[in-house]
């Protein structure tokens, strides 16, 4: 799994040996809080069937839901969690903001942010299922075109929009083939495509 910071932050997260100013994790969070007014959008991207929705669900369950004091807000946010399952079938069909209303998250030392995660379909992987129907690729409607377009094209377009238009932080979810029914090598082309899309924006990798 890799974390990428969009161009707004990249110049500040360069190590000294790269000619930049080193910042620890706390200072990064504090700086992002100040520059965004405390509202952070985490775009969870990568190939299909890597566990992006599962990551979002666990992130919400562990870090966000426990901090929601209003029981009704907590239940609404729980109802908005994405579905996840094992197997080859693609579960996510379009980009989705989770939760619908940004939730407060404390990062410690007085740093509080409002967080929304963005789920997306991801780039297609050989062997994945759910995009073919009657031996033809499914045609789907999107907010971006009046006519129907192929599922794969819609998935790529939505994923690129999450990367380029909506995310403060891009989080790439990868798979090593140790879970699920797809082999590691099936994921590699889609992983490379995801990282290349991020690098086009001039983002910096943060390990």
Residues covered by each model-derived region:
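Residue-identity detector for threonine
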Residues: 6, 36, 50, 54, ...
């Amino acid at each position: 799994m890799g974390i990428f910071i969009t161009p707004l932050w990249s110049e500040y997260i360069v190590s000294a040996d790269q000619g930049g100013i080193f910042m620890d994790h706390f200072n990064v969070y504090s700086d992002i809080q100040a520059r965004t007014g405390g509202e952070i959008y985490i775009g969870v991207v990568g190939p299909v069937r890597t566990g992006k929705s599962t990551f979002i669900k666990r992130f919400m369950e562990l870090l966000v839901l426990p901090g929601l004091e209003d029981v009704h807000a907590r239940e609404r946010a729980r109802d908005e969690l994405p579905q996840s399952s094992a197997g080859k079938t693609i579960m996510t069909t379009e980009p989705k903001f989770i939760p619908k209303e940004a939730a407060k998250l404390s990062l410690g030392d007085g740093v509080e942010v409002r967080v929304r995660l963005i789920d997306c379909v991801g780039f297609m992987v050989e062997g994945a299922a759910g995009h073919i129907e009657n031996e033809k690729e499914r045609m789907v409607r999107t907010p971006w075109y009046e006519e129907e377009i192929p599922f794969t094209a819609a998935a790529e377009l939505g994923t690129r929009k999450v990367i380029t238009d909506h995310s403060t932080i891009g989080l790439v979810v990868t798979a090593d083939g140790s879970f699920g029914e797809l082999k590691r090598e099936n994921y590699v082309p889609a992983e490379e495509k995801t990282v290349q899309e991020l690098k086009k924006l001039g983002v910096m990798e943060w390990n």
